[in-house]
Every structure is written in C-alpha cells, then in structure tokens.
Amino acid sequence: YGPLSTNTLDLILPKNLIDGAPVPLIVFVHGGYWQELSKKESLFLGKQILDEGYAFAAIDYSLCPSVKIEQIVDECRMALSWLKSAGSSYGYDSEKIILTGSSAGAHLSAMCSLTDNHEATSASYIPAATVLVSGIYELEPLIHTSINDALKMSKDSAIVLSPLFKNLKFFPQTLITWGENETDEFKHQSQAFAQNLMGDGILVETCEVSGKNHFDIILDLANKNGTLGKKFYKLIEDVCS
C-alpha cells in the first residue's frame, strides 16, 4: 500500500464473493506499543470474520525506533486510503469498512478515524465505524517510562499524537471496550475518550469485558458468542445493513 517494505497488508476474501454483492471489510491494526509485533499475530481474527461472510485485512507498519509514531500514523492512514480505493477490484464494499485495533493498534485506529485539527472536511481514510480495544488515547503518561526509549516522544509530540485532544467532528460510530482486569489508567483513558466523542455528538458504545485483561480481551473479539464478540458483530450489522 506504500513505498516501504513494511507497507504491506494481508487481504483475505470470503468464498461468497464469487457470486454475491460486495461485502463489508473488517480491518485490524495490531498493537505492541508501536515497536513490536506484526500483522501475523492478527490473522487468527480472520477465521470467524470470514465465516460470517465478511472480508478481512490486517495491516503491517514500520516500527519504532526506526521511525517515529507520526510516520506510523501516516502509514496506517495510507493503508486505509488504499483499501478504500481497492474495493471494486476485490469485491468488498469500500463504504462499509470497519476498523479495529488493540492497545497501540487502537490508538492508531483512532488516529485513522479523525482528521487533524486544521482539516475542515472528512479525510479519505476514515472508515464507516471503529472498534477500539484497550486503547491508549493520551500518550503523555508514557514519556517517563521505558516504553518511550524507542518512541522518543517529547511532551509536545505526545500531545499532538493523542486522540483525546484531537478534532473528533468526523469520527465514525464507535465501540470502545476494555477488560475488567486492565489497569486503572487504561480504563480511565477509554472512558475519557468515550466522553469526548459523545460530547461531539458521535454515536459511541462502551463495554467493560468481565474477567479479561489487556492481553486476553482480544480473544473475546474473535469469539462470536463472547461479550465483546456479540457487540462487535452487532455493530457491523447496524452499520452495514
């Protein structure tokens, strides 16, 4: 989707594309504090999504410290723009893209669901709906932690990169979720971001998943019958019907 070797994605299409109408596309952005993991760790989500008749894509991006988070945001936006332009070629509906991500992937998904403050119109990369799992929406608390050794954020850049302080006017319908056993900071940031979205008139649902923590909550997203899975597929139906 872009000029770098890291600018790749996996796009997996359901069998019903052969004769059917264009289907929704579910896009996942992996976590790893912007410095670890890859799209390979996301592919387990695809099976249930394909079984439901939807297309699935997992995005790769460059990692810190080779690049700054600003570039990662640009790369993910580029990937979304590419996916939105390629729907007619692959048989999915470019107007029915659901973007989801976990942890740092939720941060990146949020950044791909808003326009920068100077922009007056909706951007080409913004999806139809967003699902944010255990996300990070204010980055300044990370500055004085070991996580920032690779990120190299300043206070100013952390503020610029925080969805909590962004223009949310064009943000799509959103599900924000976190685990019962998350840290208080993850819970607080999720709730604060949801409040900001609702304050701007965005349709938002929140969900605390019982018994789940920062690392295993994503398994509930892959489970159609789990608490989060039910809300996830209900959102897809609501947005895409």
What are the roles of these predicted feature ranges?
Residues 123-124, 129-143, 155-192:
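The feature captures the conserved acid-bearing segment of alpha/beta-hydrolase catalytic domains
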Residues 177, 187, 191-194, 198-241:
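C-terminal catalytic histidine-bearing segment of alpha/beta-hydrolase fold enzymes
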Residues 78-145, 159:
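Primarily recognizes the serine-hydrolase "nucleophile elbow" in alpha/beta-hydrolase
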Residues 21-32:
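Short beta-strand element of the alpha/beta-hydrolase
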Residues 37-45, 57-96, 222-223:
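Catalytic nucleophile-loop/oxyanion-hole region of alpha/beta-hydrolase
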Residues 15, 32, 180-182:
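Residue-level signal for short, function-critical loop segments
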Residues 1-20:
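N-terminal cap/lid segment of alpha/beta-hydrolase-fold proteins
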Residues 25, 50-62:
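A fold-wide structural signal in alpha/beta-hydrolase
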